Amino acid sequence: MNAVDPNRAGRVVFGWNSVRIVVPTMLLASLLAAAAWTIHWPVVGDAPLLHYVVFLIDHGRVPYKDIVEIDMPGTYALQWAAIHWLGPGGGGWRVFDFGLMAAAMAAMIAMTWPEDWLGGFFGGALFALIHFRDGPTHTGQRDLMMAVMTLIACAWLMYAVRQKRVWAAGVFGLFAGVAATVKPSGVLFGAVLAALLWLRLRELKLAKAPYMIASTVGFAIPVIACGLYLVHQGALGAFVAVMRGIAAYHASLGRPSLPVLIVGSFPTVLLTVAIPALALLVLEKTWKRWEVQVMLACIVMGATSYIIQGKGFPYHRYPEEAFLALLCGALLVGGMRATGYRRVIAVAGLLAGALYLAPSSAAIARGYDWHDQEFQQMLTADLTQLGGARLDGKVQCFEMAAECQNTLYNMKLVEATGYMYDCYLFQPQQTPVSLKYREDFWEALHANPPQVLVVTDQECFKQARNFGLAGRWPQFQHYLESEYTLAAQRTPPHTLGWWRHPAVPFSYQLYVRRQP
């Protein structure tokens, strides 16, 4: 990508060699430190739920049909690959997370290579460090997978145009298709990038049909593969029903206001490098160049994806953060070959990223208390005492992500039903979709009554802890009180350090089915 005038590319700039030594050295040191400080992070947050879905699939359950869960088939496929190729525990998951970061950096370097690899390295390093500073609950997130797949797609897109390779357009489409099978908003990226490809081909007076056909075929491959898998499993109808029903209902819950989402969509963590980079974008008029337009379009699509998802979670910004970090790297490194105050702006931005943002992010990543596994340890001890392996198929969790299913995963216990979340069962305002979910769960519960129920105090999308959720469904409350006995209630003694600010630990109640 030519982020600056090619006529200035060979100009000798005072201090450039020093910056080329200091910036990558500090970035690399911060990356290595962060990797060393986070390599022992366990599988926590959303990842255990998806690990458990893969575990259930391996034990004969079919997604959407037997496992009522709202994630996309591509997510399960990548999660399955990580578990089976790298290992089922925390070590394998860290390797997968590091691998995603390495792939993101490689794609960024490929995109900036024609001018200077350092721009891609700068962007990739900052993106990785921002990801690490978000903490252990953000490892391997679906938006991270989508962001990395889109970065790789863009790298092949630029290669296809630069080298005039039709087959590379097919590879672009392939990775864009994978992104779309991970998160529905991946379709936005694919569509916008295809439009930019068409416009660039028209500008270069190249035949558009071969490139567009190749990219469309590439995009279709992972989409069709997922469809064929669902058809083979007899789950295509169930998938459509879940997406139209409970997934859409999930999207309506816990939504901040639109102004809050719009403000929150900008990754303020990157301000120290974004301000000088965006100044250069205007001063150097690099926004006119096609490669920069690709990055800007992906930034806009990333913000759009964040707003559409409507939860305000930090990891929903990953696609936007990835491309913004890349753009900053390309513009700041390119700006080093400018003159006067523009070069000063570029140097300031590069040093701010390398000397402040990178090491501070690594230090924040170090500060998480990842050792806390008290919930799992306590629940494992209780379930072992109640039968251990004999509880296979006879235990049911009521949670959203409070570590109950993570415990079952580590104990290799299959749940009694395929219903993963209690979030939709106990909403204060029920809808036809959630009432249908209740009805189906009720039927599954009575088809295979669990011997043990684990009820957590987690209330989805809220920080408060609440054991009174069952009271919102009187029929279930009566069933719980008449058919089960409260055997134990446990609260871990220490706060959870998985987030920037320690949180109240999750508690659980253990109910045992009464003997007839």
Task: Identify the meaning behind each predicted range.
Residues 73, 77, 86-103:
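Loop-to-helix entry region of an early transmembrane alpha helix in multi-pass inner-membrane enzymes
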Residues 188, 309-343:
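Hydrophobic/aromatic-rich transmembrane helices and adjacent perimembrane loops
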Residues 113-114, 118, 153-171, 203, ...:
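Membrane-interface transmembrane helices that cradle and orient dolichyl/undecaprenyl
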Residues 2-7, 11, 189-220, 281-286, ...:
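Perimembrane helix-loop-helix junctions
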Residues 167-184, 189-196, 221, 299-308:
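Membrane-interface alpha helices of multi-pass inner-membrane proteins
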Residues 187, 373-431, 435-465, 491-495, ...:
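Short periplasmic/luminal acceptor-recognition loop of GT-C membrane glycosyltransferases, typified by
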Residues 108-130, 147-148, 161-167, 293:
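Transmembrane-helix signature of polytopic, membrane-embedded enzymes
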Residues 95-118, 152:
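Transmembrane-helix motifs of polytopic, lipid-linked glycan transferases
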